[in-house]
Swiss-Prot record:
Species: Saccharomyces cerevisiae (strain ATCC 204508 / S288c)
Listed PROSITE patterns: PEPTIDASE_A1 (PS51767)
All copies of domain Peptidase A1, residue ranges: 1-77
Signal sequence annotation: none
Organism classification: Eukaryota, Fungi, Dikarya, Ascomycota, Saccharomycotina
The protein's name: Uncharacterized protein YGL258W-A
Pfam families named in the record: Asp
């Protein structure tokens, strides 16, 4: 990813994913920053991989997750 290679963003904080709760069908992903208003506890990080060799309008980024669970209304990884 060009911004990471140019040193404009840090690899450690390159995205944040907000799932929006257990009973909704959408969320949001923010690249290049973390929105601290969307969480109260420690963040989890997961490796990302590109589906294609280049990132363009037809590309997508895949985040592979083995499992996600909601326990007492809280997301458990």
């Amino acid at each position: 990813m060009a911004f990471e290679r140019q040193g404009k963003i840090e690899k450690k904080i390159s995205y944040s994913l907000f799932l929006n709760g257990p009973n909704v069908h959408f969320g949001s992903i923010l690249f290049g920053a973390v929105d601290k208003s969307k969480y109260a506890e420690e963040l989890c990080t997961h490796p990302m991989r590109q589906a294609y060799n280049t990132l363009d309008s037809n590309s997508r980024i895949i985040i592979t997750v083995q499992s996600v669970a909601i326990l007492d209304g809280k997301l458990v990884w």
